[in-house]
Every structure is written in C-alpha cells, then in structure tokens.
C-alpha cells in the first residue's frame, strides 16, 4: 500500500507557481500541469492544448479537457512546502506506513499544544516588558508582586515549551502524493482558460476518442482518480501500453518505434513498425505492466544484441537505421557512466540507500544549504545514481 501511495507522487512533482496569490488560479495551473503530464506520459496525447478553446481539426475539445479537470480539482495535492520566502501556497505531506494515521494525529495534537504554549509565552513576555517600562513611583521599588508573578509565569511557560519539544511524538514517514479532497465536484469550463471566467459545468469523465465499453463509472462522492487510472490501463485502451513500450524502446535504442514519444496524435510521427509496437504492447499487458520484464525481454532479443558494425548495403537502403539493422551509437547518460565507473572500480554499493539526505536538512532554502547537502550526501556517494538527492 505504501508503494502505491508513494507512486501518486507523480502528480505532485511537477512545477508550481508557489508565489501565486490567488488560490483558484494556482489550483487551475496545477490541474493543467497534471493533465498535461498524465496525458503525454501515459497516452502520448497533448490534451492540455484544449484548455482555452476548441481546435478546428483536433478531436479533443474543451469539454473533454474539463471532464478530466473535474477529476483533478476534486483531488488534494500534497507537495510539502511552507509559506514564506515568496511561497504563498503551503501544503502538507502524505503520512505513510502502518501507524502513520495515528502518529500524524499525535503530531497534530502536540503541535497545537506547542503553538498554544508559545502564544502564551509571547503574550506573557510582552506583559513583562510593559511592567519593566512602567514609571517607578517615588520611594517605591519597581519590582513589585506583578513583576515577580510575571517572571515566574514566563519561566514556567519556557519550561513547558522545552518539555513539549523534548517529548515530541515520533514523526511518521511522509511522501509527496495526492488524495481525494473530500469535496468532489464536476468542473466548470474556464472561458479562454481564465480561472475567473466560468462557463457551463462538465461532468467528470474520460476522453471520448478512446471508446472503452467497460469504462468504470465515477461516483459523485469520489474524485474519479481511481476510476481514471483503471480506464488508463484498461486492456481495451489502445494507447497506454503502446506508449509505455515505445518509451522503453526509445531508452534502450536511442530512438522510439514512434520517434515522437510524447505525441501519438496526428502531429506526431507514424510508427516505423506497427506490428512490433502492437506485439510489445500485448506482451506488456501479459507481463502485468512490469517494466523489468519488458526490459529483459527486449534486451534478450537478437535486435538489441546486434553489433554497431557498418554494412554498406543496409546503409544504402536505410541510412537512418529506422529498421534497426545495426545497434546505433548513442550517448550514454551521466548516471550510467558514473555507475559503471563505480562498478568497475569495485566501489559500488548495490544495496538500496535507506533514508533521505534532503530530509536531514528539513524545510529550508536549499539555495543556501547546498554545501550542507553535499557534505551530508557523503553516505550516498557509493550507491547507484538513482539514490542521489535531487532538489526540485
């Protein structure tokens, strides 16, 4: 369950205009980014183009866009930031783990007690300062019972705050992610994409250009995100599996079977080998969408194991190697080079890194803490690059 919750972080990781003052504008920009990322990554479609108006020759219209928007406006995005430093859109994080709900409740109760004590301390300290500044009367000491009582109260509150901080309940594990907002509702069309110019309500739903007879219905009290996910990976959905395996092919060979990996629409390129794409898509579904199994199957194929030797006859017929008669030279990414060097030198630790270096720094301005991050990241340096801390 924790892995499934953490996987929803895909919807929380995108760029955000955190200094946006208007909450509705911020929400609609966030929703647009989520629709754009999901439609491109999973379907290979540019759905976000329909946010402002219909396009004459585009089968995806504004109603389709806002049918999806209703799903995401009914979803709460937890990306974990605090107000301050130009950020006007605070957000919590999602507690995960067996005791996460109980621990989160304990932390919330404790935080309220601590905040109340700090408020009392601030008020008492202010009163004490007023007493100190009070004009002294002739032949009388300014140190009266009022000052003694207030000093005692301030000392007690400081001791209470110290005790609360010392005995804080343990924090649960947290992750970025999304959950249902609890206030699910259909979305109104925003005329010309302006959050303040509202049009008619559009019922939550899916893209009609992908007709699936067994598409799950969205209950009024739910966001529809779960049903949307089921619709995306439905075996009758012609795009999701093809887009997935095409991305894997692109990563392994340097070029996808469809070269425009983010665009399977009319403006994208046609697949160079439709039958191969269909076959791999079927195999992905049979493998229960396992990326590891698909990578293994492709890498064990004769095509992947071809050499990069030149062949004059093949080159004359297919100079771009679109039909994979040889293994194309391709640039290795920096992470793979780093891991290879560590492995060859015997310094690579193959075990998964435990914990989070960024979590050790807490909620800070990373621009000023970058040196601390480098120093604290020493224990990660022998692990694979996938575990290196990335600042977003």
Q: How would you describe each model-predicted region?
A:
Residues 1, 28-30, 59, 102-387, ...:
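Primarily short, surface-exposed interaction patches in extracytoplasmic proteins
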